[in-house]
Every structure is written in C-alpha cells, then in structure tokens.
Amino acid sequence: MTRSLNEALLEGERLRPFGRQVTSPAQGQTLADVPIEELLALALGAKVVVLRGFGLLGKAELENYCRAAGEILQWNFGSILDLVVRDTPENYLFDRGDVPFHWDGAFAEQVPRFFLFQCVQGEGSGGETVFCDSVQVYREAPEDLKELWARATITYRTDKLAHYGGLAEWPLLGTHPATGETTIRYAEPLDPARYANPLFLTVDGISAEDGVRVMEDLRERLHDARYCYAHEWQTGDIVVAENHSLLHGRNAFTGSVARHLQRIQII
C-alpha cells in the first residue's frame, strides 16, 4: 500500500451518523489497490465504508479479491448478485418499491461478516440504500424493552421464489462475533398486499400482546434518523458494510430505475 492511499484510508471523511467515505488519492487506482484486510478492518469500526474514485472490478476479479479475506457465500446464481429492477419481479429486491430492513444470511447456512456493493450504474431518483446501526439502537433502548427483546425469538417464513426462502428461527438479540456487542437481528414483515414474495413473522418467548408491542416499537425505533445512514448512489461507488451490527434496506425509487448494483458477501 502506498503512503498516500494508507493516509486516505485512515483519514477519509466521516459520514453521519456513522460510516466513512474514502476518495481515491490518485487517478487510475482500482478496488484491487486497496488491501482487503485493511478495508474490512476499517468497515468493522466504521460499519459502512464508501469508496469513491476507485475503478470497479470485473466479476471474476471481484470474487478473487474478496476471497482473499475469507469464504464467499454461494447462492444458486453464484456469488455475485446483480441488483436491477425487473419488469416482472418475483421478489421485492427487484421491484421499484422500498426494501424493508433485514440482515443478510437469515436463510443461509452461514451469516456473512461483510457485504460489498459495486455500483455499475447509478443514475436514477430515490432508491437510497439505508443502513441502521442496531448496536446503537440497543444501547439507547429503555431497559424494559431490552428485557422483552432478550426473551423474544422470531420465526420467519417466506416462499422460495428467489435465491432464499423457507423457515428461519432467530433470537431477536445476538452477540457480535468480533466485538461482543449486543445486536438486533430483525427482518421487518412484508405485507402480501404490497410486496412480491411476502415475509411472515411469528414471535415466541413473550406474550402475544408483548409481541405486538415489540414489532410496533421496532417499526418506529429502527427508522429513527439518529441510527440510520442513507447512501445516495453514484456510478462507480463501492460500499462495504458490516453485516452483524447493521440492518439494511432500500428507499423506494421515485424516478428512473436504471440502476445496477453488484453484491458479494464475505463469510
């Protein structure tokens, strides 16, 4: 790593309320010039890292780059998901509407530590990717709510119409494997009247009344602007996110939907 790039990674620009943006210090640099372990270490602390001015990698190069840091999560389509709006979407991820909060890997055999997006084409209005710092949400929650959360287990059910689906059961609270911090593991329910491939939730471990209270509270608390960073995409952006502490989703598109993201997940 050159000294100038090292300084750029260490300094960067702080995002609000969390995250860091790093701009390439010289022309001609690509993602491959950023050591993956340095990048993930930065992402572990900042939770979200935005790289601008770095050239994107082809799919094979991107997979090799990320594999240097660990195993890559594989799906039926391979390791890299092309996120584009489709004319007849079988899943809400490919629709022009919003994507409620969730975490990656709820229906997978292993939960990824990080995921990385490349923005191949970023033109359009709306569609910001929104990240919620669940660690901070937990820290600032009232004690009586924390006690309910600690007893709650949620079963998620969705038809496998895309690359994931079935049944998954998770405690509402988790422990971050690297930092030991308490995290919130929650995927918001998806109303079948609004979303392709809806998601249904059952809350166990607490009373039905408390289950309703928990879900209604999370609907408001997780979307509090104090805990959320909304990324407005530009063509060429690279975003690395820490999957254990964050929940993420997407705002609905309000105009053109000619956007193309590529996503890969590192276990």
PLM regions and their residue ranges:
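Active-site environment of non-heme Fe oxygenases that use a 2-His-1-carboxylate facial triad
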Residues: T2-T30, L44, I80-T235, V240-I267
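Short, acidic/polar
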Residues: A32-L40
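Structured binding elements
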Residues: K47
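Structural motif
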Residues: R52-G55
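Glycine-rich loop at the start of a catalytic domain that most often binds anionic cofactors/ligands
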Residues: K59-G70
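Beta-solenoid repeat scaffold
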Residues: A69-F77
